[in-house]
């Protein structure tokens, strides 16, 4: 047992311009090699492009995209009796959002396009509409969980 006290729970900070935690989560996931100012630049340019494309509130588009991509259930490999089963497990809201952001960024990196801001804005708009690679990934995950429903008792 640890002799230390209990660790303080860290609260997620919000970004300086929009004061939004989702934007901050997105910035922290897009971050590479410690270049946070570049990550902020990419996200803010993407938000401006979303504003130009949809002519609606870009933060609501971002929220809707993340909400649509967030999975309810996923599969986890579990070794039982010498064989590995894909066991469906429910996902919490924070972990679901983190997965959704990861999938959105992965899908936008694979997209053809000029720069990351353009690709990210396109993927977010598509996800908000209900199409795109990230949505496909979510549906694929849900299909896997449904197919392996028989192993749900292995939790």
Swiss-Prot record:
<keyword id="KW-0699">rRNA-binding</keyword>
<dbReference type="InterPro" id="IPR036823">
    <property type="entry name" value="Ribosomal_uS7_dom_sf"/>
</dbReference>
<keyword id="KW-0934">Plastid</keyword>
<dbReference type="InterPro" id="IPR020606">
    <property type="entry name" value="Ribosomal_uS7_CS"/>
</dbReference>
<dbReference type="InterPro" id="IPR000235">
    <property type="entry name" value="Ribosomal_uS7"/>
</dbReference>
<dbReference type="GO" id="GO:0009507">
    <property type="term" value="C:chloroplast"/>
</dbReference>
<dbReference type="GO" id="GO:0003735">
    <property type="term" value="F:structural constituent of ribosome"/>
</dbReference>
<dbReference type="InterPro" id="IPR023798">
    <property type="entry name" value="Ribosomal_uS7_dom"/>
</dbReference>
<dbReference type="Pfam" id="PF00177">
    <property type="entry name" value="Ribosomal_S7"/>
</dbReference>
<keyword id="KW-0687">Ribonucleoprotein</keyword>
<keyword id="KW-0689">Ribosomal protein</keyword>
<dbReference type="GO" id="GO:0006412">
    <property type="term" value="P:translation"/>
</dbReference>
<comment type="function">
    <text>One of the primary rRNA binding proteins, it binds directly to 16S rRNA where it nucleates assembly of the head domain of the 30S subunit.</text>
</comment>
<dbReference type="GO" id="GO:0015935">
    <property type="term" value="C:small ribosomal subunit"/>
</dbReference>
<keyword id="KW-0150">Chloroplast</keyword>
<comment type="similarity">
    <text>Belongs to the universal ribosomal protein uS7 family.</text>
</comment>
<dbReference type="InterPro" id="IPR005717">
    <property type="entry name" value="Ribosomal_uS7_bac/org-type"/>
</dbReference>
<dbReference type="GO" id="GO:0019843">
    <property type="term" value="F:rRNA binding"/>
</dbReference>
<comment type="subunit">
    <text>Part of the 30S ribosomal subunit.</text>
</comment>
<keyword id="KW-0694">RNA-binding</keyword>
<protein>
    <recommendedName>
        <fullName>Small ribosomal subunit protein uS7cz/uS7cy</fullName>
    </recommendedName>
</protein>
């Amino acid at each position: 047992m640890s002799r230390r006290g209990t660790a303080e729970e860290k609260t997620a900070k919000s970004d300086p311009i929009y004061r939004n935690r989702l934007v901050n989560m997105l910035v922290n996931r897009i971050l590479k090699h410690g270049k946070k100012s570049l990550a902020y630049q990419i996200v803010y340019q993407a938000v401006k492009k979303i504003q130009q494309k949809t002519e609606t509130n870009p933060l609501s588009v971002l929220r809707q995209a993340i909400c649509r991509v967030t999975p309810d259930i996923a599969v986890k490999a579990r070794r039982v009796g010498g064989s590995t089963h894909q066991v469906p497990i429910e996902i919490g809201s924070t972990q679901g959002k983190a997965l959704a952001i990861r999938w959105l960024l992965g899908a936008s990196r694979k997209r053809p396009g000029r720069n990351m801001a353009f690709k990210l804005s396109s993927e977010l708009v598509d996800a908000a509409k209900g199409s795109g690679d990230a949505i496909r990934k979510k549906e694929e995950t849900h299909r896997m969980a449904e197919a392996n429903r028989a192993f749900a008792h292995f939790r």
